[in-house]
UniProtKB/Swiss-Prot annotation:
One Pfam match: DHO_dh
UniProt-listed Gene3D superfamilies: Aldolase class I
This protein's GO CC annotations: cytoplasm; plasma membrane
Subunit comment: Monomer.
Protein name: Dihydroorotate dehydrogenase (quinone)
Cofactor binding description: Binds 1 FMN per subunit.
Binding site for substrate: K66, N111, R112, M113, G114, F115, N172, N177, N246, T247
Entry annotated with the keyword Nucleus: no
Compartment(s) where it occurs, according to its Swiss-Prot or TrEMBL record: Cell membrane
Predominant location: membrane
HAMAP family: DHO_dh_type2
Role played: Catalyzes the conversion of dihydroorotate to orotate with quinone as electron acceptor.
Amino acid sequence: MYYPFVRKALFQLDPERAHEVTFQQLRRVTGTPLEMLVRQKVPARPVTCMGLTFKNPLGLAAGLDKNGECIDALGAMGFGSIEIGTVTPRPQPGNDKPRIFRLVDAEGLINRMGFNNHGVDNLVENVKKAHFDGVLGINIGKNKDTPVEHGKDDYLICMEKVYPYAGYIAINISSPNTPGLRTLQYGEALDDLLSGIKNKQLELQQKHQKYVPVAVKIAPDLLPEELIQVADSLVRHNIDGVIATNTTLDRSLVQGMKHCDETGGLSGRPLQLKSTEIIRMLSAELNGRLPIIGVGGIDSVIAAREKIAAGASLVQIYSGFIFKGPPLIKEIVTHI
């Protein structure tokens, strides 16, 4: 009930400042008795996916808690899973500010953050302190100054460090805000990356005596023939899941709106139909051979159900959470 008032205050601020203020407060309560202030009871809706049991099918998408600073406070709100990151081997500042823009009328966001984060070592220390009893995903990427042809090395470094602490690992090769990153979704570059990741996963399984599934996060801007090739590569390399989708470069639904021409990835409601269509095509191509985590514009129970009807086993929210707040979590988990 209170969130519309909180949102009104936060939306008076620059989007990144609003995020900082929110996280300052969440950091104060996380891991303390004050967590009760953000806790909400949601029904159990267990789902098995990638060999893991999720308390419910709703997760927080990567990008909100990049450094894993507020895992427990976010978990208290009722998420079945939380995906932290994207994290890179070394800390990096990301792109110049301003780098995130609200399209309020469209309930969308455009961001060009550029993987700003404190580095994988810092994230691991934060994860060690967390007590979240859901599934923790860790989303990994490459540093901006790492040449794309050496990008695989960055993913393997991050995998090595997060493996003991992750419920699953997400491979982000689809952000539009790191130059050249999306080229890793195609042909030989994708095969080489997936081969290296699978070998590292099996090596780490032996080392730690546990299997941590790996999911690859893809873009919504792939052509149908490109999507078929991606699906084929994921199956051939025995990848455990696919996260569909990241943000889009397509501005067709927001033409004429304030900030619509800002560089970056568009998320929120304008992405809803596009991401659902990708899930539908991907599901038809995969035919149950690996699960899909659906994300992109989910802002209601109906939007979540549409993703599942299209073929997703789990769903995630981000922009919808910014616009609708914690009540959206309870609403989706209760009625999905």
